[in-house]
């Protein structure tokens, strides 16, 4: 796939992105493909999962209010690790934008308000962008200008799957994911499976999302001013 990110962003890919995220979190994020930060501190992150074609027929099972209770519990599970790494801990989580299925761009959007122990708050927006053979997860955090919903919606516009790999290109006989979009969303958020039998591979996603990984903006700004790239030594 291709991601059209403005030239105003500083971009890290692969191992460079992994190194930066590890420095500030103390946790490996070796699945990240692209990390980008804009001039005003806004942040993007993208990674792809080769799951097969994700169906959307279980979307009616999604219950945002029920999800939120478990989301809060799961985010707080990460607090012990964050404390060990000298990071602020999660105090509360609420919906900024409840999960929304966009049939035009074959994407799911949602955003969370996160309150921290240092009396700050952030908004983390996410998009699950569906393709023929899997899906791309995009994440967005606002910078100096605050959270802007249009920036979240833009995740599915600046990301383009390669020709014949878009969601609409699916054909009978192609690989189909073991779970639908509702169950995938639940797993991504760290919520219990909507129905029994969710695959173990899906549960591994919980490791990724129990940690709020977007970083203190002033530290990132200073780092990027020094160099466009920082590599692991």
Predicted regions and their residues:
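Conserved polar/disulfide-associated segments of primarily extracytoplasmic proteins
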Residues: 1-2, 15-123, 173-190, 196-204
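Envelope-exposed proteins and targeting segments
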Residues: 5-7, 42, 125, 134
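Extracytoplasmic/secreted envelope proteins and their assembly/folding machinery
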Residues: 6, 68, 72, 149-156
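Short conserved aromatic/hydrophobic patches within beta-strands of well-structured domains
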Residues: 7-13, 155-160
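Extracytoplasmic/lumenal ectodomains and periplasmic regions of secretory and membrane proteins
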Residues: 113-182
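Juxtamembrane, membrane-proximal amphipathic segments and lipid-exposed surfaces
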Residues: 171-178, 221-233
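Alpha-helical transmembrane segments
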Residues: 191, 213-228
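Hydrophobic alpha-helical transmembrane segments
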Residues: 207-212
